[in-house]
Amino acid sequence: MASNVEDTLIKLDRLHSVDYKNDEVQLIKSKIEGIVHQISNRIGELNPILSNSVVHCGSFYHNSKINAPDEFDFLLVLNKFSQPGVCSCKPFEDPEYTHLVSLGIDNTKLNWNPQSVLEWEEDAANKQTLLQATIDSEYRNAVCSCLATMSLPDGISLTTSQKSVRRRFEGGEEFLANFKFSGPALTLLLNWKGVYYPNLNISVDVTYVIAMRGLPSFCNLDKRLPSEHLIVKAGLCADASHELLYCRMLDDTWKQTCSVLENKIICFWFKENDASNVCYRLLKIIRNLVTPVNQLGEAFLKTYALKTLFLYECEQFPDSKFWRTDELSTHLLTIFQKLLSAIQNRFLPNYFNENQNALCYPLDSRPEDENEEGENKFISSVYEAMCKIIEDIISSLEKGLASEQTLKFYFEPGQKIVIKDPDIQDALEKEN
């Protein structure tokens, strides 16, 4: 039987999790998917070389979305470029960046001959760079052409983001009022007018990728897991693929990611036992309620760090019997203790690339002599506030386990700590 603390955690999850059985949630899902498939089809019609398949990704599609159905993630897999033998990879010239590769495209296998590239450029390396830049520019042109004429379903309209100011000064981004490009990603900013959600802003990320068979070069998942591990037995490593995302600022360089595999692994664990999903949602809920944010309301502790810790925990304890709703507080306590240790070390190994840090700035940084005083103060302030909050979370869970307190800490959270990011502040002042 669940204790008071477990009952409280289950109540907290129900209070903040998206109700997937809600008809309006399913209606929003259907309309968003319709928009994305319309974009996908239209891109292929406008430019057949960019014909693509839609892949659903992100928290909404493994039933771990919290608060509202306000974020959707999709990949557009470029079918022709993802065919075997069309694209080849070699390690990036700087070994420090193991997640980057240089791409070669055999355009003769595609019957693709963009005249502006092939007629005027003789150098093979430059030709490759231009070919890859052409993919990106033609994708953007197709998207803009599509959105200019696309009609939206009833109840949904284009809107602008409250974070528009930030988007305007982020490097490498182009803000276009109702949608923006960030590298290979398109973000649509939409608004839903419904009954349960009368005024819901929704962001939809649509990212074009090239799919490659096998695990990426930096990933040792298949080597670190024994053959009897559930992930291996389920064939998730043997049937794995990874994606390439175009890095526009680095010539022919592409970033290797494991978005589809990550999604499959998370869905696999959640299918084994729903208690693990509850635990993962609670990690995000507690983060949202009590951890520090910047002046735009964005958490310094990103979801990816929590996801990374959760995946490691599932890998270490794969038995579905381990994940029980009457032991939620114990699971949360363990994960937050590991999170505190990672933040104190300023390093959390990425789940798929253990040499890469899953913590983001400023949590991955230490004050340095060469930094400006304001930046060092900012890094120290975020670090100290984050450690203090996580220590409080750990203490509340320990007290809950010891005395079965009801964890009012999460139902009556105090005012959030807001720490101003000097980069954002400078840009805001320039805007004004």
UniProtKB/Swiss-Prot annotation:
Catalytic reactions of this protein: GTP + ATP = 2',3'-cGAMP + 2 diphosphate; GTP + ATP = pppGp(2'-5')A + diphosphate; pppGp(2'-5')A = 2',3'-cGAMP + diphosphate
Cofactor: Mg(2+); Mn(2+)
Keywords: ATP-binding, GTP-binding, Immunity, Innate immunity, Magnesium, Manganese, Metal-binding, Nucleotide-binding, Nucleotidyltransferase, Transferase
GO function term, MF aspect, one: 2',3'-cyclic GMP-AMP synthase activity
Residues involved in Mg(2+) binding: E71, D73, D205
Root EC class: transferase
Pfam families xref list: Mab-21_C (PF20266)
Residues binding ATP, per UniProt: S59, E71, F72, D73, S259, V260, L261, E262, K284, T303, Y304, A305, L306, K307
InterPro entries, alphabetized: Mab-21_HhH/H2TH-like, MAB21L/cGLR
This enzyme's EC code(s): 2.7.7.86
List of residues binding GTP: D205, K255, Q256, T257, C258, S259, V260, L261, E262
Example GO biological process: innate immune response
Role noted for this protein: Nucleotidyltransferase that catalyzes the formation of cyclic GMP-AMP (2',3'-cGAMP) from ATP and GTP and plays a key role in innate immunity. Directly binds some unknown ligand, activating the nucleotidyltransferase activity, leading to synthesis of 2',3'-cGAMP, a second messenger that binds to and activates Sting, thereby triggering the immune response via activation of the NF-kappa-B transcription factor.
Annotated family: Belongs to the mab-21 family.
Protein name: Cyclic GMP-AMP synthase-like receptor
